[in-house]
Amino acid sequence: MKKIENKTFGGERPLFGAHDICMEGITITDGESGIKCCSNIECHNSKFYGKYPWWHVDGSVITNCYFAPESRSAIWYSDNMVMKDCTIDGPKFFREMNNLELENVSINDADETFWKVDGLKLKNVKLHDGTYPFMFSKNIYVDGLESDSKYVFQYCHNVEVHHAHITTKDSFWECENVTVFDSELNGEYLAWHSKNIKLVRCHISGEQPLCYMDNVVLEDCTFDPECDRAFEDCSNIDAHIKGAITNIKNPISGRIEADGIGSITYTEFAKASAGACEIIDKSK
């Protein structure tokens, strides 16, 4: 690989069409499309300030780099990328990509980040602020995620999450084939309108979780007292709850078991009669 060290690039497309290069200590200043239509590139200990600095790149490794707020929409249409030990302060990163892997990365404005990514692996990643991370992405594996960004994981398919701490309402909406292990899911309206959802040893908080769903499985999950009106219009439920749940409302079918159930509500709008879903209060 050709080495480029300790240089500054500005203007339009200064490294357009570069292949087989290793960059160390470079700076991309004001301008656009600093690295574009490239392949087989490494970049280490560098800083990015210009807009759209990394588009249409196939095969890249980025480590110990900083992306400033001005570097918005920085990495799009780039496949087969590994990023480690980086800090990102710009919005709208990582769009329409295949095979993207991040480890020890902090994203401090996660607005519209990870859109339409197929094949995403995250390890020890932090997301802050912004809306709709992960929209329309699929084939996702996460181990270690802290996020207070709004509306994460919407319209996603084939997702596996471990050791996450997620704080937002409307997470995991319109999703299919999702499994979450050993995580904290904080926020109202968890996983509405989703199907084939499995939660294992998770703690759930927020109003009206898990509604309008088909095929939802819970294993040894716990609920905060604020979790009322759970499982409304849910079918094919298989829920084993540790501790108590405050309220269950209008479930359609399946089985719900908890150590304690505050109340069960069936209204005139219920889509199934009482008893169609088996509900077991182990305290009685």
List where the protein language model places each region.
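Long, distal/terminal scaffolding or interaction modules
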Residues: 1-284
